[in-house]
């Protein structure tokens, strides 16, 4: 893997469901603050990181990644800020949110942005499998190509938890940031 800087942002505790979701989901009576969260990342945190460390500032050198609702948020941010985030890591993303809003967004969106995407899910995540597979098919339909700018993985028996995501972290980092010969 190529040398990189990882910046981890706390998950906001109780406000996580609001801050990590792009739309209000009336069924859950929550959500819809992802754009505000994205503004913080794009206009406060990333400039601070770029100022504080020696970074490569291009989108092709910058990723956003997350698991569960953080995966939903990361895809939304990649789609809405492709000039900032050129790589997206989606570990067990919450595709189910707001009746699969993110899949509908991709289906009706215009030109697909130039993003390199890692998408995975555990086969032990019964609730997540169907939506993640649907998202995978939509990404293919929109022009992403396996092995080039998309990697899809179903981790055998993996559950929806930090341990499972941690076990896949090296894999997704190697795909998004491969070592250059």
Go through each PLM region and give its residues.
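Non-catalytic cap/lid and distal C-terminal segments of serine-dependent acyl enzymes
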Residues: 1-181
């Amino acid at each position: 893997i190529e040398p990189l800087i990882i910046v981890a942002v706390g998950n906001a505790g109780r406000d996580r469901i609001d801050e990590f979701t792009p739309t209000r989901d009336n069924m859950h009576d929550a959500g819809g603050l992802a754009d505000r969260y994205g503004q913080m990342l794009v206009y406060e945190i990333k400039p601070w990181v770029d100022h504080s460390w020696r970074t490569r500032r291009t989108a092709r050198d910058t990723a956003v990644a997350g698991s569960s609702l953080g995966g939903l948020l990361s895809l939304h941010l990649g789609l809405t800020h492709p000039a900032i985030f050129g790589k997206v890591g989606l570990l067990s993303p919450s595709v189910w949110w707001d009746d699969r809003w993110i899949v509908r967004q991709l289906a009706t969106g215009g030109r697909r942005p130039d993003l390199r995407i890692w998408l995975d899910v555990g086969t032990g995540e019964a609730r997540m499998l169907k939506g993640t597979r649907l998202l995978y098919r939509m990404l293919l339909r929109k022009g992403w190509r396996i092995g080039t700018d998309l990697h899809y993985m179903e981790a055998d028996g993996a559950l929806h938890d930090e341990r499972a995501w941690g076990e896949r972290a090296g894999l997704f980092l190697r795909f998004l940031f491969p070592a250059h010969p």
